[in-house]
Amino acid sequence: MSDVARILKEARDQGRLTALDFAKEIFDDFIELHGDRNFRDDGAVIGGIGRLNGQAVTVVGIQKGKNLQDNLNRNFGQPHPEGYRKALRLMKQAEKFGRPVVTFINTAGAYPGVGAEERGQGEAIARNLMEMSDLKVPIIAIIIGEGGSGGALALAVADKVWMLENTIYSILSPEGFATILWKDGSRSEEAAELMKITSGELLNMGIVDKVIPERGYFTSEIIEAIKTAIVDELAELSQLSTEDLLEARYQRFRRY
């Protein structure tokens, strides 16, 4: 098995820590909030408020399940438009009260069903991109599994984008890439090599800003490393004026 194939397998492993796991382990007194105030609550997106070293932080994440029933409840981590609208509601609330935002991303992509399209999936994703680009508080996005397509990007327009070591971030799945390009989904491993989707490759290209090591570390050590990194980064970002924060975020994405 190639290194890319191994990382792809680990990124999709059902035993990985979820967004809710990180929210509860990293932040004290985490309180989950629900609903988009428009249609319904989407179990694929979790969000709420917690404390980090005494500072209130808004946490948003895409949640996969840990077993079949959990995955059915979470729609296998594929958000509907109401999930993205819930995320935006919480982020705008964070802006109103001056709370930084941390997002945890693990999705193969936004849900492509008819109902999701009818309720404005494309609009919901596009609005998140627009609103996050101008959100007047610090944002840190962390890829914790799969970072698939616009469904992931809708929570990743951030001042800093990080990845865990054994995760992926891509425009679509390697299977989808192989099917479109070669009409043969079985060539997914070859596609993954071409796509440059691993954390190390993306760090080298400047797409992400930090890779958090996983191999050889216990779960508690990974959680502590993420917590420390968030604390340090928020301390730096909080020193910037709102104007400088937004300009740096804009220039970060203009580099692409």
UniProtKB/Swiss-Prot annotation:
It is found in: Cytoplasm. It comes from the Bacteria. Pfam families: ACCA. One of its GO terms (cellular component) is acetyl-CoA carboxylase complex. It catalyses: N(6)-carboxybiotinyl-L-lysyl-[protein] + acetyl-CoA = N(6)-biotinyl-L-lysyl-[protein] + malonyl-CoA. It is an enzyme of class 2 (transferase). Keywords: ATP-binding, Cytoplasm, Fatty acid biosynthesis, Fatty acid metabolism, Lipid biosynthesis, Lipid metabolism, Nucleotide-binding, Transferase. One of its GO terms (molecular function) is carboxyl- or carbamoyltransferase activity. GO terms for biological process: fatty acid biosynthetic process; malonyl-CoA biosynthetic process. Acetyl-CoA carboxylase is a heterohexamer composed of biotin carboxyl carrier protein (AccB), biotin carboxylase (AccC) and two subunits each of ACCase subunit alpha (AccA) and ACCase subunit beta (AccD). Belongs to the AccA family. HAMAP family: AcetylCoA_CT_alpha. This is Acetyl-coenzyme A carboxylase carboxyl transferase subunit alpha. It comes from Streptococcus thermophilus (strain CNRZ 1066). The gene is accA.
